[in-house]
Amino acid sequence: MAAFARMVKGQVRNYSAPLDMAIPASKQKYIPSSGSYPKGFLVSGTHVGVKASNTRFPDLALISSETPCSAAAVFTTNKFQAAPVQVSKKTLQERQGQGIRSVVINSGCANAVTGKGGYEDAVNMGKKVDECEGLSKPSTLVMSTGVIGQRLPISKILDKIPTAYANLASTHEAWLTTARAICTTDTFPKLLSRTFTLPSSPGHTYSLAGMTKGAGMIHPNMATLLGVLCTDAPIAPSALQSLLKYAVSRSFNSISVDGDTSTNDTIAVLANGAAGGAPINSASSDDYAAMQEILTSFAQSLSQLVVRDGEGATKFVTVRVQNSPDYDSARLIASTIARSPLVKTALYGRDANWGRILCAIGYTQGVAPGTVVPERTSVSFKPVDGSAVLKLLVNGEPEQVDEERASAILQEEDLEIVVDLGGGEKGELGGEEAVYWFCDFSHEYVTINGDYRT
């Protein structure tokens, strides 16, 4: 772990977070020193040099199961879907979510808007991994991230895939290096793992591991954000897809850095059943309910690391919309607040300008009729230290705000904004609630993205 210990000042945004770790001191706490990884999964991170300026850092990730997996994925809604997205979609459809063995990912080039040639490049990446596995049917999902509109140096990648396959390992260091290999403007690799049990198999201990990348162009459905989750629990493909869809809607699709949606987003989950036990195949089972809670909570923790690494970000903000007639309306309001440049810049400037929050609530499109009524809307700042909330607006009436306390709350790295649509503790509309996580906008964000291609 010594390689991950060097501290630097400011927001360092090399194209990929280097292994000799130019990681801000405040971010080092997010790098795990150990992990509990699922049985039967092997991983590797290999240097290819996809981006010409990358002369030594790993930029090719390979995740492989020793046995066939159930697999599911959620993809970007951007109309310009990248070649690897198209290829992975086709593979999952043809295999009906069964028999998937690997995921191969390159960073440094998105392979998006690259025509037929780019599509063939993505196909050939998957084929090369399948050849290494000795498989004749497409069994590999493909992901790419980086600059849009440029072709991959496909010969270099194909030449290095056998090396990546030969270097597959199950150690914590291998998982960490693999998580690092998918980074672009991230300042740290994002990796989590945990163990769990299921009601029907209390004697079996299962593991769940996940890695993700993303720091900018983040406002899913989904954004320039990749993620792979692996578990050794036995889950049928149909159950796995619905579990992932639910988890992603409340995690990776509930975060925002800058409001942009990319061409490449993919979150995939692989389940190989290597830890044994009864398979999860029914949405009505106790195991399914438990797995839904476990996967959603895990995905939320993983996705929040993306927000904490937002380009130029200085704050991690939770917005909680309560007492809505339905979840979708609450989520739309939370999303609108999270992507408001005026809200984000006010938070960066430590300005308790709650009028900007109220404005975002008011112009939210698509909410159910009667959801937003000014006379019963309340807005508060909730400090993370457990102290009393700072009420800004109560039932449509402005409070006398203690500006000194507001400034003190906004100086903290973490902050929660609470929007109550019911106008009281219990509310008049019901108990539906949605949560979104986002970061502020700073001068650094402009600098980072102005220099992106260099």
UniProtKB/Swiss-Prot annotation:
Gene3D superfamilies for this protein: arginine biosynthesis bifunctional protein suprefamily, ArgJ beta chain, C-terminal domain, L-amino peptidase D-ALA esterase/amidase
Pfam family, one: ArgJ
Positions of disulphide bridges: none
Keyword Secreted carried by entry: no
Binding site for substrate: T184, K213, T224, E311, N449, T454
Pathway assigned in UniProt: Amino-acid biosynthesis; L-arginine biosynthesis; L-ornithine and N-acetyl-L-glutamate from L-glutamate and N(2)-acetyl-L-ornithine (cyclic): step 1/1; Amino-acid biosynthesis; L-arginine biosynthesis; N(2)-acetyl-L-ornithine from L-glutamate: step 1/4
Enzymatic reactions: N(2)-acetyl-L-ornithine + L-glutamate = N-acetyl-L-glutamate + L-ornithine; L-glutamate + acetyl-CoA = N-acetyl-L-glutamate + CoA + H(+)
Cellular component terms (Gene Ontology): mitochondrial matrix
Site (Involved in the stabilization of negative charge on the oxyanion by the formation of the oxyanion hole): T145, G146
Residues the record marks as site: Cleavage: A223, T224
Post-translational modification (record): The alpha and beta chains are autoproteolytically processed from a single precursor protein within the mitochondrion.
Record keywords, A-Z: Acyltransferase, Amino-acid biosynthesis, Arginine biosynthesis, Autocatalytic cleavage, Mitochondrion, Multifunctional enzyme, Transferase
Subcellular location: Mitochondrion matrix
Protein task: Catalyzes two activities which are involved in the cyclic version of arginine biosynthesis: the synthesis of acetylglutamate from glutamate and acetyl-CoA, and of ornithine by transacetylation between acetylornithine and glutamate.
Protein family membership: Belongs to the ArgJ family.
Quaternary structure annotation from Swiss-Prot or TrEMBL: Heterodimer of an alpha and a beta chain.
Protein name: Arginine biosynthesis bifunctional protein ArgJ, mitochondrial
Originating species: Aspergillus clavatus (strain ATCC 1007 / CBS 513.65 / DSM 816 / NCTC 3887 / NRRL 1 / QM 1276 / 107)
Taxonomic path: Eukaryota, Fungi, Dikarya, Ascomycota, Pezizomycotina
